[in-house]
Amino acid sequence: MQRSEIWLISLDPTIGAEIRKTRPVVIVSSDDVGTLPLKIVAPLTDWKLHYAEIPWMTAIVPNRQNGLEKPSSCDAFQVRSVSVERFIRKLGSLDAKTMQAITQSLVEVLGIEE
């Protein structure tokens, strides 16, 4: 399990407005940190046209490399740490350009100054 990989995981149980159910996520945590069996992930959801106006949503076009079947969006606002026990199967991985866009969304959402 490495940064930029897309995995199908179970996010339930959830509370309130947390994104739920079994869905794809992208691993956003660094491969160089962490000794616990945890990964930091950002969930993917079906693409909707109005997401183009939301700065923390990154569009992802399905292709063979990423293993997605439909246009999706990475929701950086819903980033979270999850146990590797939630991971079901690897779908694919993202290209460097898409990963950079997701990283920039995380910088904005988390208020990190570069």
Place the predicted regions along the sequence by residue.
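Conserved functional hotspots at enzyme active or ligand-binding sites that engage polyanionic ligands
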Residues: 1-114
